[in-house]
Regions:
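Catalytic-site microenvironment of enzymes
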Residues: 2-263
């Protein structure tokens, strides 16, 4: 009896399954609010995630099966999915543009609204005021954060002429060495993924400098991503299918992990 009791107390903790760590973010919506923290890959890192447009400005508009696709809704959904991926890897995340009702959505056509705020503040209609507002919030949070690796990620959905299919394009601020490195690591990750999942298609996305307001006026190292052409019928598949939106978020997260890992080498 003593031997059996001894085995129970010694082996039980070893055999018991370790309870997974979890977090909760209401902005993800009821179905996705709770997430598991599966690794510490991004422990000590902090991210400022900004989806394009929002509030009174829907951004680019495409037509899919007779219904409108609004850029701000798709950029926001992907930002939320990216935030969840980063949090699951142990990162600290600030979601700058917020809609307390939407959450992560799995539908094809994401209904448009003007509810979005910038950290709770109404979003101005004036473009410069709108961009300044989000940059000011990023910079304010940046000054408070003590993390050693801090990055801002801006996500948009490109709207070129209807006939052009686009890939994913990565931009960094002029002369930003760290921004360029992050953009390159994201690009290489996408290139590998396309080679694996669509080997006959090829990946034609590029990395380049771009003198954008948000890249010039944010303090943390920043990248700006154009995720597709919302007006192109073929390219719309990258946006309307939930699995594709999730894949975009996954790949961006993997590229970020790669970028951080290279610093530690």
């Amino acid at each position: 009896v003593l031997f059996v009791t001894f085995l129970f107390f010694v082996l039980s903790p070893l055999l018991a399954k370790k309870k997974p760590r979890t977090g909760k973010e209401a902005l993800f919506g009821k179905e996705y609010a709770t997430y598991q923290i599966t690794s510490n890959e991004l422990s000590g890192a902090c991210f400022y995630l900004v989806s394009g447009h929002g509030g009174p400005d829907p951004g680019a508009i495409g037509i899919y099966q007779g219904r409108q696709l609004h850029e701000d809704e798709y950029a926001y959904d992907i930002i939320l999915r990216l935030a969840r991926e980063l949090l699951s890897r142990g990162a600290k995340v600030h979601i700058i543009i917020q809609d307390k009702k939407d959450g992560i959505r799995d539908g094809h056509v994401l209904a448009n609204s003007k509810r979005e705020t910038c950290m709770g503040d109404p979003i101005p209609l004036n473009q410069v005021a709108r961009l300044k507002q989000r940059c000011d919030w990023v910079n304010k949070l940046y000054r408070k954060d003590k993390s050693s690796y801090k990055r801002a990620v801006f996500i948009h959905v490109d709207s070129r002429s209807k006939g052009q299919q686009t890939d994913v394009f990565f931009y960094n601020a002029p002369k930003s060495t760290k921004g360029r490195r992050l953009a390159n690591n994201l690009h290489r990750t996408f290139d590998r993924k396309y080679d694996k999942h669509q080997p006959n298609r090829g990946f034609r996305g590029t990395v380049s400098e771009r003198n954008l307001y948000v890249l010039r006026n944010t303090t943390p190292v920043a990248v700006f991503l154009e995720l597709g052409n919302i007006r192109n019928k073929r390219d719309q598949q990258r946006l309307v299918l939930k699995n594709n939106r999730q894949a975009l978020a996954n790949w961006i997260a993997e590229g970020i992990v790669k970028d951080l890992s290279l610093i530690h080498i």
